[in-house]
Amino acid sequence: MSEFRQATDAFASNPVESKQEIRNYTMNFGPQHPAAHGVLRLILEMDGETVVRADPHIGLLHRGTEKLAESKPFNQSVPYMDRLDYVSMMCNEHAYVRAIESLMGIEAPERAQYIRTMFDEITRIKNHLMWVGSNALDLGAMAVMLYAFREREELMDVYEAVSGARMHAAYYRPGGVYRDLPDRMPQYKESRWHKGGALKKRNAGREGTMLDFLEEFTNTFPARVDEYETLLTDNRIWKQRTVDVGIISPDLARAWGMTGPMLRGSGIEWDLRKKQPYAKYDAVDFDIPVGTNGDCYDRYLVRVAEMRESNRIIKQCVKWLKANPGPVMVTNFKVAPPSREGMKDDMEALIHHFKLFSEGYCVPAGETYSAVEAPKGEFGCYLMSDGANKPFRVHLRAPGFAHLSSMDAVVRGYLLADVVAMIGTYDLVFGEVDR
């Protein structure tokens, strides 16, 4: 008899060994799991179906964004910001360009400030539409995703019309924005699905300017939000999956540095747009929705209410922009490129253009921290300059990183199925978490 067979028989005949049972087991949740929202990897220690401990692993989407920004001139790193939270692109840009403007002591024209405010809120609605659709899909409500993407597609067209890109816009610039709002919206082309009267009906709202299109959007959007709420807010299954699940107390939210809907869902009224106004948020009227219980359901209600408030802000910005034409970029050619027409007639303008896009501009030595109220929370940019044309240090404060850090403290004691609901309400995007 072989030694292996002897050892096997001895193990099988041992009465003590045969009675041993595994109480807790470890399970990998993600990064391939459909509810992982990107590349989330959670190591869950389970006691049956109950979560005993959660260990989030990060870094699978790390691209060294901060170091990349430190190797480029200041004005060439704006596109990197779009690729952090790639659902809330322009809000990321806003924090970065505000930091540069703070160090240089420049201020964007008033019209550019209103445009930034308007597009920050367009971005917020886009983010929350993606969130409500994907979170509902995670919990089994498939129809909401189709409804939400109907409106999100219209806002993607607005992005494309103003910047040429549906996602990575690179529209904000130090000193203003890339260009003024276009006079017309993209039109649907004839296809085998859309032709004749149907095509004309789809293009009916796109005959005017972008501001006309957005004005019509703000008039119809509240009724669309009502449709989402009809599907979810009083839905018995939705409430069973979210009410009293993932409760985050105000003290816990503060201790983990939570911001945005995660913090306001726990009843803390903190919003940088009100507490530390930037752009033109001090000139528009809106309210800050807050929750009471701090559970997944409250965080859902806060985000739905935020979409309504963002719609109010966009409507006010559209009204002001229609009545007040003006420049959207500073006229300092050391910071802003000259017009193409000017470069054809003026050699000095051509030199400015060449210098600006070859070596950029030198930012005075100093350091600053600039933060914006992004859809997921406080997105901040700490920028340090040594007087050169490249940043000495760039540090990005991503709200999702702080929120993910609290995962272990929040999920303990809940069932595995509840973890999916909690991850959904965290609204994680790993471009910003891993950076």
Swiss-Prot record:
Record membrane topology: Peripheral membrane protein
Pfam family, one: Complex1_49kDa
InterPro entries assigned: NADH_Q_OxRdtase_suD (IPR001135), NADH_UbQ_OxRdtase_49kDa_CS (IPR014029), NDH1_su_D/H (IPR022885), NiFe-Hase_large (IPR029014)
Compartment(s) of residence: Cell inner membrane
UniProt EC number: 7.1.1.-
Enzyme class: translocase
Chief location bin: membrane
Xref: PROSITE patterns: COMPLEX1_49K
Alphabetic keyword roster: Cell inner membrane, Cell membrane, Membrane, NAD, Quinone, Translocase, Transport, Ubiquinone
Catalytic activity: a quinone + NADH + 5 H(+)(in) = a quinol + NAD(+) + 4 H(+)(out)
Cellular component per GO, a single term: plasma membrane
GO molecular function, one term: NAD binding
Family the entry assigns: Belongs to the complex I 49 kDa subunit family.
Oligomeric form and interacting partners: NDH-1 is composed of 14 different subunits. Subunits NuoB, C, D, E, F, and G constitute the peripheral sector of the complex.
Task performed by this protein: NDH-1 shuttles electrons from NADH, via FMN and iron-sulfur (Fe-S) centers, to quinones in the respiratory chain. The immediate electron acceptor for the enzyme in this species is believed to be ubiquinone. Couples the redox reaction to proton translocation (for every two electrons transferred, four hydrogen ions are translocated across the cytoplasmic membrane), and thus conserves the redox energy in a proton gradient.
Name of protein: NADH-quinone oxidoreductase subunit D
Organism: Xanthomonas euvesicatoria pv. vesicatoria (strain 85-10)
Gene name tied to this protein: nuoD
